[in-house]
C-alpha cells in the first residue's frame, strides 16, 4: 500500500524522514552522495549549456534529461537502502546473466555504433550501455564468491570465474578497454581484500596485463591513444587534439578559475566536454582551489566508505562496501587522470558529474549498496530472513 509519505518520497526522492532513525555513518554516507550529485548537476549545467543551446535551441535540454535520470536513480537508491543485502545477493546472479546477454546484444543488429564502438542498445530515443550496469552486479557477485570462497565447491568457483572472464571479454570486444580494465581491477582488488592465495592473484594479474597489452598492440586507435598521451603536442590537431584542449582548459583555470559558467574551452573547442572531459571544464571554471577541494572530498568519501566497510563483521558485506568504494573512487581518479594527461585517453565518465543515464543509474545503485552496508553494520538494523548469513570474521 502506497502511503502519503511513500508517494512524497517517490515524487521528491531526496525527501526521506526515516533517515533520522539510521545510524550516523549511514546518514553521513547518504549526505556525501547527495553532495556529490549536487556538485555534478552544477558542473554539468555549465558544461552542457552551449551544446544544448546549439542542438535543441534551449540551454536546458541536457541538464533536464540528467535530472530525470537522477530522479529515477534516486528512487532505485531509496529502494536499495531498504532492501536487505541477503536479498540482493540472492538476486544478483540472475541480473548478472541478463546484463551479460544485453552486452552480447550490442554486437547484434540492436547495437548502436558510436565513435567506432558498439557499446549501446537503442530503446527508441534512449540509448543504454549494458556494461555500466555490470559494475554493481560484479561487486555483489565477486563479494559473495570471494567472501565465501572456501564454501564454494571447485566446480562452482570455476563456473563463476569463467563467467567473470566471459564478461570482461565481451566488454573488451565492443571494444571498451577502459571499462574492461576498471572491472578487472575491481574484481582483482576485491579478491585481494578477501585473502585469496597469492598464486591466484599473481597469475590473474599477469593474464590481465598481457590481455591489455595485446589489445593495445592489435587495435590502431588504442595504440594511437597511448602514443598521443605520451606526447599530445606532437599531433595537436589530430590524435592529441582532445588532450591538448583539456590541458588548455585546466591551465586556463589558474588558481581560482575563470568563474562558474565562464569556461571558454566548452564552446566547441573541447570535445565530449559533458562526459569524458567534464573535469577539464570544472578545473577551468573553479581553478586549482576547486580541484583540490574536490580531491579532498574524494578523500573524505574514501575514508568514510572504507570505515563503513571495515566496521562490518560479515566478510561478504565488508567486501561489498570495499567494492563500491573501489569502483566509484577508482573510476573518478581514472577520469581525472585522463583529463589532466596523467593517463591515456579512455571512455570512462566521472561518476555523478558526466552526462549519461546508464552511468547515472549504475552509480546510484552502487551508492545504495554502500548506504545499505552502513545500515547493516549496525546489527540492530539488520532484517532477519531466516537464511544462513555469510561467515563472520
Curated annotation (Swiss-Prot):
Primary localisation category: membrane
Documented EC number(s): 2.4.99.28
Transmembrane segments: 31-51, 61-81, 85-105, 120-140, 158-178, 182-202, 243-262, 286-306, 319-339, 351-371
Listed pathway(s): Cell wall biogenesis; peptidoglycan biosynthesis
Subcellular location: Cell inner membrane
GO cellular component assignments: cell division site; plasma membrane
A single GO molecular function term of this UniProt record: lipid-linked peptidoglycan transporter activity
Membrane topology note: Multi-pass membrane protein
Top-level taxonomic group: Bacteria
Pfam families membership: FTSW_RODA_SPOVE
Cytoplasmic membrane side: 1-30, 82-84, 141-157, 203-242, 307-318, 372-393
Stretches of the chain found on the membrane's Extracellular side: 52-60, 106-119, 179-181, 263-285, 340-350
Catalytic activity from the UniProt record: [GlcNAc-(1->4)-Mur2Ac(oyl-L-Ala-gamma-D-Glu-L-Lys-D-Ala-D-Ala)](n)-di-trans,octa-cis-undecaprenyl diphosphate + beta-D-GlcNAc-(1->4)-Mur2Ac(oyl-L-Ala-gamma-D-Glu-L-Lys-D-Ala-D-Ala)-di-trans,octa-cis-undecaprenyl diphosphate = [GlcNAc-(1->4)-Mur2Ac(oyl-L-Ala-gamma-D-Glu-L-Lys-D-Ala-D-Ala)](n+1)-di-trans,octa-cis-undecaprenyl diphosphate + di-trans,octa-cis-undecaprenyl diphosphate + H(+)
A biological process term (GO) from this entry: regulation of cell shape
Keywords recorded for this protein, A-Z: Cell cycle, Cell division, Cell inner membrane, Cell membrane, Cell shape, Cell wall biogenesis/degradation, Glycosyltransferase, Membrane, Peptidoglycan synthesis, Transferase, Transmembrane, Transmembrane helix
Function text: Peptidoglycan polymerase that is essential for cell division.
UniProt similarity note: Belongs to the SEDS family. FtsW subfamily.
Protein name stated in the entry: Probable peptidoglycan glycosyltransferase FtsW
Organism per entry: Synechocystis sp. (strain ATCC 27184 / PCC 6803 / Kazusa)
Amino acid at each position: 500500500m502506497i502511503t502519503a509519505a511513500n508517494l512524497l518520497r517517490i515524487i521528491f526522492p531526496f525527501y526521506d524522514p526515516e533517515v533520522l532513525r539510521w545510524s550516523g555513518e549511514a546518514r553521513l554516507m547518504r549526505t556525501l552522495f547527495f553532495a556529490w550529485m549536487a556538485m555534478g548537476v552544477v558542473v554539468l549545467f555549465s558544461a552542457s549549456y552551449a551544446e544544448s543551446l546549439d542542438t535543441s535551441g534551449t540551454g536546458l535540454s541536457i541538464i533536464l534529461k540528467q535530472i530525470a535520470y537522477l530522479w529515477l536513480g534516486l528512487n532505485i537508491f531509496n529502494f536499495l537502502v531498504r532492501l536487505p543485502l541477503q536479498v540482493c545477493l540472492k538476486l544478483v546472479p540472475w541480473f548478472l546473466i541478463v546484463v551479460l546477454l544485453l552486452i552480447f546484444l550490442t554486437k547484434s543488429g540492436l547495437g548502436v555504433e558510436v565513435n567506432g564502438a558498439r557499446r549501446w542498445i537503442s530503446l527508441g530515443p534512449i540509448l543504454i550501455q549494458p556494461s555500466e550496469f555490470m559494475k554493481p552486479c560484479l561487486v555483489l557477485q565477486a563479494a559473495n564468491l570471494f567472501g565465501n570462497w572456501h564454501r564454494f565447491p571447485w566446480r562452482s568457483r570455476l563456473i563463476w570465474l569463467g563467467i567473470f572472464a566471459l564478461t570482461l571479454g565481451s566488454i573488451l570486444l565492443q571494444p571498451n578497454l577502459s571499462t574492461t580494465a576498471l572491472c578487472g581491477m575491481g574484481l582483482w582488488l576485491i579478491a585481494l581484500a578477501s585473502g585469496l592465495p597469492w598464486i591466484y592473484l599473481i597469475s590473474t594479474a599477469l593474464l590481465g596485463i598481457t590481455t591489455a597489452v595485446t589489445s593495445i598492440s592489435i587495435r590502431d586507435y588504442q595504440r594511437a591513444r597511448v602514443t598521443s598521451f605520451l606526447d599530445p603536442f606532437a599531433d595537436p590537431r589530430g590524435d592529441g587534439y582532445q588532450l591538448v584542449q583539456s590541458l588548455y582548459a585546466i591551465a586556463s583555470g589558474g588558481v581560482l578559475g575563470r568563474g562558474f559558467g565562464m569556461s571558454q574551452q566548452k564552446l566547441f573547442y573541447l570535445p565530449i566536454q559533458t562526459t569524458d572531459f567534464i573535469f577539464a571544464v570544472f578545473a577551468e571554471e573553479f581553478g586549482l582551489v576547486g580541484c583540490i577541494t574536490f580531491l579532498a572530498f574524494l578523500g573524505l568519501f574514501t575514508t568514510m566508505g572504507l570505515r563503513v566497510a571495515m566496521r562490518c563483521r560479515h566478510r561478504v558485506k565488508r567486501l561489498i562496501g570495499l567494492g563500491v568504494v573501489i569502483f566509484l573512487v577508482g573510476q573518478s581518479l581514472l577520469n581525472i587522470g585522463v583529463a589532466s594527461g596523467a593517463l591515456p585517453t579512455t571512455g570512462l565518465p566521472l561518476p555523478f558529474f558526466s552526462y549519461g543515464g546508464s552511468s547515472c543509474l549504475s552509480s546510484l545503485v552502487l551508492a545504495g549498496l554502500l548506504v545499505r552496508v552502513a545500515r547493516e553494520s549496525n546489527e540492530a538494523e539488520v532484517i532477519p530472513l531466516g537464511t544462513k548469513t555469510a561467515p563472520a570474521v
